[in-house]
Amino acid sequence: MSWSILELLRKNPEDLKNNLKRRAIDVSLVDKAVELDKKWRQVLQEVEKLRHQHNVLSSQISKLSGEERKKKIEESKNLLKILEEKEKELEEIENERDRLLSSLPNLVADDVPNGPDDSYNVPIKFWGKFKVYEGDVQEFLKQIKDAKVNYEVIKWKPKGHAEMLEDVLHLGNTLKAAEIAGSRFYYLFNDIVWLDFSLLLFAIDYITQQGYTLVLPPYMLRGEVIQSVIDLDTFKDAIYKIENEDLYLIATAEHPIAAMFFKEEIEKDKLPLKFAGISPAFRKEASAANKDLKGIFRVHQFHKVEQFIFSTPEDSWKYHSELITNAESIFQQLELPYRIVNIASGDLGACAAKKFDLEVWMPAQAKFREMVSCSNCTDWQAFRMKIRYVDRKNNRRGYVHTLNSTAIASTRTITAILENYQREDGVVEVPKVLRKYLEAFPKAPKDYIYPLKNKII
């Protein structure tokens, strides 16, 4: 099976144009690619004809002798030079065509909402009991629209996670971190650190019980690899590069896991391959210069557990559903109320054919905030990384499909816990599902996180 974008280019370039229009992409690139592909196929025919002629000559030479043999050998040498030049031309055209096609985003799935930005995202599910301050009820109802949800109106206004972390609990300090490292860094202390680790342990415990292989991946990738996994030209302001080194810090375990089979083939009967990666995540957040400046919701480093699947093309949508179901189960066990959102075409990243976000209700902010991103990247990454499956039984090869989803992003989930589990007196309840991961440690919180009387720093 050929790459889906190339296949659509050949079968129906107008459909490819229409697909790109859903992302507001310049469709003139399709016309350029069509011309390059026509040229490639034309030169390929010439190359195949020359190869045939050379094979015929080689066969004739083996049966000749004397001057006739010398004449044919010279003719063969000249033909070989022409063939080599044509093969070089073919390779150059193919590289130019594939470079152009590789600059295109993935094909958008049919059931993705059309729209240029996140205002066109469509909520498709709500879960849990939503805690809503009495002054925010109208705003809440506006956000849920006509959905039937279970919510509780409270008379006291919950404090934002940043205030809870630094001014109430005294278990974090972003100002001092900013002095020594810059904005969007933090110090976390004692019970919040235990909470961070318990979230990670819970996530890897749950996901591995679903049959996923636990992975601790490299925290850096070479330029060639990261360029294949993501659209680096678009995301260069989001990724940290090591100065004077061909190395980039990873933004998620998705990237090194996706590259695990870089330029390799996988036997079809071994698919699916399911992994749970745990790693730090490093992000510049340059495009979010004025967003979430306080607290630890949007930061340059955090811990993350990622789900990742290599799949056959025919099964990838089934596994996309599995990934978001796993993520939902995690947040249901944490008892954090959320909604699932089908992301609009103009808000999709280049890699994804379709993406679900899981957004938790934040009662202090009176809004839903993204905790999980779950994408089916179909063959977009696999083509760029040259990862194929081999079907020996039917003598076929094709590109695998890759899928990814957050299981837990620790700092974001902590912000959701601080806002949803706080009491009016400032005490924060530890989610019940996390408590067994804390029991073995004498200094870890067990049931509640209590405010300190004094700041640590």
Curated annotation (Swiss-Prot):
Per the record, the pathway is: Aminoacyl-tRNA biosynthesis; selenocysteinyl-tRNA(Sec) biosynthesis; L-seryl-tRNA(Sec) from L-serine and tRNA(Sec): step 1/1
Output the InterPro entries linked to this UniProt entry.
aa-tRNA-synt_IIb, aa-tRNA-synth_II, aa-tRNA-synth_II/BPL/LPL, Ser-tRNA-ligase_type_1, Ser-tRNA-synth_1_N, SerRS_1_N_sf, SerRS_core, tRNA-bd_arm
Q: Which GO terms describe its biological process?
A: selenocysteine biosynthetic process; seryl-tRNA aminoacylation
Molecular function (Gene Ontology), one example: tRNA binding
Positions with a binding annotation for ATP: 283-285, 299, 370-373
Q: Main location per UniProt?
A: cytoplasm
Q: Does the keyword Cytoplasm apply?
A: yes
Provide GO CC annotations from the record.
cytosol
List the Pfam families hit by this protein, alphabetically.
Answer: Seryl_tRNA_N, tRNA-synt_2b
The record's subcellular locations are: Cytoplasm
Write out the entry's keywords from A to Z: Aminoacyl-tRNA synthetase, ATP-binding, Cytoplasm, Ligase, Nucleotide-binding, Protein biosynthesis
- What's its EC? 6.1.1.11
Q: Which annotated residues bind L-serine?
A: 252-254, 306, 406
The chemistry this enzyme catalyses reads:
tRNA(Ser) + L-serine + ATP = L-seryl-tRNA(Ser) + AMP + diphosphate + H(+); tRNA(Sec) + L-serine + ATP = L-seryl-tRNA(Sec) + AMP + diphosphate + H(+)
- Where would one find coiled-coil regions in this protein? none
Q: Which family does it belong to?
A: Belongs to the class-II aminoacyl-tRNA synthetase family. Type-1 seryl-tRNA synthetase subfamily.
Q: What is known of its domains?
A: Consists of two distinct domains, a catalytic core and a N-terminal extension that is involved in tRNA binding.
Q: What is the protein's given name?
A: Serine--tRNA ligase
Natural source organism: Saccharolobus solfataricus (strain ATCC 35092 / DSM 1617 / JCM 11322 / P2) (Sulfolobus solfataricus)
Lineage of the native species? Answer: Archaea, Thermoproteota, Thermoprotei, Sulfolobales, Sulfolobaceae
